[in-house]
Amino acid sequence: MELWYTEKHTEDVKFSIRVDRELYTEQSKFQRIDILESKEFGRFFTLDGLMMVTEKDEFIYHDMIVHVPMATNPNIKKVLVIGAGDGGTIRELTRYKTIEKIDMVEIDESVVEACKKYLPKTACKLEEERVNIVYEDGLKFVRNKENDYDLIIVDSTDPFGPGEGLFTKEFYGNCYKALSEDGILVNQHESPYYEYYAKSMKDAHEKIQGLFKINKVYQAHIPTYPSGHWLFGFASKKYDPIKDLNVEAWKSLGIQTKYYNTDLHVGCFALPTYVIDMLNEDKE
């Protein structure tokens, strides 16, 4: 008997991967956690049936959510990561020796423990000495922070269930307050392609652009995410991700990446016309 993982992207579109075996399943206090193994994508991790990470393509997402802000301001010292229980974002951040402190706020400890055991490729740096893991609601955590971080990365799930509060105006306002005077906020911005995800993308962008001086959106192709076309939000009090990119400074760090490079850094902000039109709809 064949076993397949299937995720519904719309009422008329489904995405499937043949599964070799199920490694782990748990219904935590917050969500259902599954870790499966496949021939094509290696091990992969889902929450409430939705794809989070695969061993084969996780490098794309984690490269883009980390190295774009870090190349924009290589002097970042203090970082807050909200979500990111699989550890991939933390892994990439720890490659920067200049970072002094990484606070990771994850609501579900079960996710972290499962990923440590079954996804060591992403979770390999969660116990690094600069990393402080707090098991708490990210919305609640940032309420009490002011001028504490140079970079906040919102590596959240989709805007429902446990991650719903991380897409509110209150949350983004608290992130702004928690950032230093030249702070940067980066978040996963959903997909612009299917209507449901596009609405979430536009809602998040509208809330963020009312707060920050600089607001940009950039993109990557992630094969296992809905439509494959995925966006990230870049918001900053000071730094422009293109004008302030110092190519030589970043290259001098000697960080070897699999997806990100400084040419791509500039190019990923060149959006398709249909996405630009969506982002401008609320301005008209």
UniProtKB/Swiss-Prot annotation:
InterPro entries tied to this protein: PABS, SAM-dependent_MTases_sf, Spermi_synthase, Spermidine_synt_N, Spermidine_synt_N_sf
GO CC field: cytosol
Occurrences of domain PABS (ranges): 2-237
GO molecular function: spermidine synthase activity
Subcellular location: Cytoplasm
The protein's Enzyme Commission number: 2.5.1.16
Catalysis performed (reactions): S-adenosyl 3-(methylsulfanyl)propylamine + putrescine = S-methyl-5'-thioadenosine + spermidine + H(+)
Keyword Nuclease: no
Biological pathway: Amine and polyamine biosynthesis; spermidine biosynthesis; spermidine from putrescine: step 1/1
Keyword terms: Cytoplasm, Polyamine biosynthesis, Spermidine biosynthesis, Transferase
Positions that bind S-methyl-5'-thioadenosine: 31, 106, 137-138, 162
A single BP term in Gene Ontology: spermidine biosynthetic process
One of the Pfam families matching this protein, by short name: Spermine_synth
Main location: cytoplasm
Transmembrane annotation, as ranges: none
Domain of life: Bacteria
Keyword Protein transport included in the entry's annotation: no
UniProt binding sites for spermidine: 62, 86, 155-158
Catalytic-site annotation from UniProt: 155
Similarity annotation: Belongs to the spermidine/spermine synthase family.
Summary of the function given for this chain in its UniProt record: Catalyzes the irreversible transfer of a propylamine group from the amino donor S-adenosylmethioninamine (decarboxy-AdoMet) to putrescine (1,4-diaminobutane) to yield spermidine.
Assembly with partners or alone: Homodimer or homotetramer.
Protein name in the entry: Polyamine aminopropyltransferase
Lineage of source species: Bacteria, Bacillati, Bacillota, Clostridia, Eubacteriales
Encoding gene (name): speE
